[in-house]
Regions:
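Catalytic cores of secreted/periplasmic lytic hydrolases that degrade extracellular macromolecules
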Residues: 1-122
Length: 122
């Protein structure tokens, strides 16, 4: 329900929201996910060094939901957003996100996200 609600609010397909989160969080058990509530590999500030002695460049969120909302807000600030808003094509969205530099390995990331979307019938 969260991905569907965010999809309606932000115009980003739920399949893309879920596909990226599944890949970036290793379906939930990743360290970023567990310690930072970060399901999307978004870089930013955190307090893990101070609280646990762990140095990381990834952003910390108060809740899982906050991570999902931040991903959607991040998409609204991308150049491609106006032309793709409310477009249901996962392929076009993933290609645009990849091309915009979301990942350090865009071609591999794109393949993996699209594969995740297909594999989970999103």
């Amino acid at each position: 329900p969260l991905a569907d609600s965010l999809s309606r609010s932000y115009g980003v397909p739920a399949s893309v929201i879920l596909g990226v989160s599944l890949l970036e969080s290793a379906s939930g058990p990743s360290r970023n996910c567990r310690l930072l509530n970060n399901y999307f590999g978004i870089v930013g500030k955190n307090n893990l060094l101070r609280t646990r002695g762990i140095r990381t460049r990834y952003k910390q969120y108060a809740t899982d939901t906050a991570s999902f909302i931040d991903f959607c807000r991040l998409m609204t600030r991308k150049r491609f957003y106006p032309s793709l808003k409310n477009n249901p094509s996962s392929l076009l969205w993933v290609q645009a996100i990849s091309k915009a530099g979301y990942s350090e390995v865009p071609a591999i990331w794109q393949k993996r996200v699209l594969s995740t979307i297909r594999q989970h019938h999103l």
